Amino acid sequence: MPDVLPREGIRLGLSADNRWDAVRQCGAVLEELGAVEEGYARTMLEREQSISTYVGEGVAIPHGTDASRALVRRTTLAVLQFPIGVSWDGERVTTCVAIAAKGDEHVAVLSSLAQILLEPDQAEKLRSSSDPNEIHHLLQSISKDIQE
């Protein structure tokens, strides 16, 4: 099984005008990775309009609607870091963990991500690391949980 979080899906030092721009960028990376069909980014925006994907600690998890699963070629994560931050319903998001899931894998992502965010040192690394390898290593537990 291919890596759920490919290293080329980790993008650091980005900027976004607003949360909608950040979500569009997330969708574009998933499409660039070949994980989703064209149109998936639009469903990510639809999801965000219906309910915020902000999960706390400066992290959001943009993902598509349930109906968009037909557009997912393979379950994949991408990490986009916005060091300056993006306003997200009054919160400041510095990291987006974009999710393309064929099934209910997003539940495992949430569970594993929650464990990382509960550890202040790990949460800080996720938000501020300038090393893609460090981010990849930090999030390997999520990949393993999804692949099990």
Q: Language-model segments: what does each one mean?
A:
Residues 1-148:
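Cytosolic covalent-transfer regions centered on His/Cys nucleophiles
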